[in-house]
Design a protein with these regions (language model features):
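Conserved alpha/beta core segments of nucleic-acid transaction machinery
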Residues: 34, 137-178
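Short, intrinsically disordered low-complexity segments
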Residues: 22-25, 111, 134, 172-174
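General N-terminal targeting signals
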Residues: 10, 41, 118, 149-151, ...
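Secondary-structure junction/capping motif
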Residues: 1, 30, 55, 98, ...
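A short acidic, often aromatic-flanked loop/helix-cap motif at beta-alpha or helix-coil junctions
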Residues: 28-34, 122-125, 168
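Conserved inter-motif catalytic segment of the P-loop NTP-binding fold
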Residues: 1-67
């Protein structure tokens, strides 16, 4: 899945996949338990961005368990590189300006910045619009929302086009700043 998606993205911009710059590691243990192995790869390959999908699995326990969440953040910070962790939010959240990851409040509180990704997609359509909303930033002002129209050409390519998030009625209701 990851390789196919990366090929689609690179085809969408007319470029080759930079294989020497991308690494994928399937994890079978909590992030904190595997930190020495992860650190070794980060150091050996000079990795400057680690993407953790998903944060709940990386914590190694219940998402409401503050010990597991704190362990994840301590391990992540020990790498001394940028970490992007992907977490889910509760679907029933009525207060759109206070959207936070489900589980322990530590997911939101310990993060340096939080961005929410929402999308509007019709069934069986090869395109959708996604909005990216800045919900939290330590030592920085909140940023305006961004939006992209994403278009799929079968398994061949994926293209992203900048668009106005306020122009989509569904996504307009999710915006952090107008």
């Amino acid at each position: 899945v990851h390789a196919r998606r990366m090929h689609g993205l690179m085809n969408g911009i007319g470029a080759d996949v930079p294989a020497q710059h991308l690494r994928y590691k399937r994890m079978h243990a909590p992030f904190a338990d595997a930190i020495e192995e992860i650190r070794s790869e980060v150091t050996e390959h000079k990795i400057n961005l680690v993407i953790c999908d998903s944060a709940s699995m990386a914590s190694g326990g219940l998402i409401s368990d503050e010990v597991g969440v704190a362990g994840f953040f301590l391990a992540a910070r020990s790498l001394d590189t940028t970490i992007l962790s992907i977490a889910h939010v509760a679907k029933s959240n009525e207060n759109r300006s206070m959207v936070k990851p489900i589980g322990s409040s530590y997911w939101f509180n310990q993060a340096r910045a939080c961005w929410e990704v929402t999308h509007d997609q019709d069934e069986n359509e090869p395109r959708y619009v996604l909005a990216i909303n800045h919900r939290k930033g330590n030592n920085q002002q909140r940023q305006r929302a961004m939006a992209f129209r994403v278009e799929f050409d079968g398994d061949h390519s994926i293209q992203y086009h900048v668009t106005n998030p306020a122009a989509n009625p569904t996504l307009n209701r999710t915006l952090s700043l107008p």
